[in-house]
Design a protein with these regions (language model features):
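Beta-rich carbohydrate-recognition and catalytic domains
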Residues: 1-208
Length: 209
């Protein structure tokens, strides 16, 4: 290792890395996913990198877990979370589709011209993810401006409540304030809207709730 190489922190094998995603203890190991662009040292169409550890100190990279492959996430797999149910690993994330690409750089869009859908994928072992067969869109892009923003609604956090599974999303209200959207599910696949929370003075979009 060189003096500038991390030895006890997760670092992408190369290129770009940002948000940690889907941290979970599953089948005897800690799993950490993270936003990455594996084609250059810059932001681009987001993928999910994947690393595992038995002690939270020594990490082994498992390559790319999620990559753009469906209409709902063709331009990026944004941040999200992970849960386990009946031995299966569930990953939830925001898929992005550009409505207007930057003609000078197709990894970017122009003027926030994109929409965001909420996606899920499952794995039986936490290592192999079939990005073609096992992805599905669970919440379509927001269609009612009073509810949220079709572009800036993202970063699903899923957890088990006393009576059901719950999800919270960060979004941007039509009043210019940040907003949280709450959803509920009995089976981790079919989600229904519950309510929203908003407050002025705390930013225009509440990312990564």
């Amino acid at each position: 290792h060189t003096m500038t190489t991390n030895t006890i922190h997760i670092k992408a094998p190369g290129c770009w890395m940002n948000d940690p995603n889907g941290f979970i203890y599953y089948k005897g190991k800690y799993h950490m996913f993270y936003q990455c662009f594996p084609y250059g040292p810059r932001w681009g169409r987001m993928h999910w990198g994947h690393a595992v550890s038995e002690d939270l100190v020594h990490w082994e990279h498992k390559g790319i877990a999620l990559f753009p492959s469906k209409r709902g996430d063709r331009d990026g797999c944004f941040s999200g979370s992970a849960v386990e149910q009946d031995g299966k690993l569930y990953l939830y994330y925001t898929g992005v589709s550009y409505l207007l690409e930057d003609p000078e750089d197709t990894n970017l869009c122009l003027d926030d011209q994109f929409v965001s859908a909420q996606m899920m994928i499952t794995s039986e072992d936490g290592i192999h993810f079939d990005n073609i067969k096992d992805k599905r869109e669970i919440i379509a892009p927001i269609g009612e401006r009073e509810m949220g923003d079709a572009a800036h609604t993202r970063d699903p956090k899923v957890w088990r409540g006393e009576d059901a599974w719950y999800m919270v999303l960060g979004t941007h209200g039509n009043d210019g304030n940040g907003r949280l959207l709450f959803y509920r599910s009995a089976d981790l696949e079919n989600w229904s809207y519950v309510n929203a929370v908003s407050k002025s003075g705390f930013g225009w979009m509440w990312e990564c709730p």
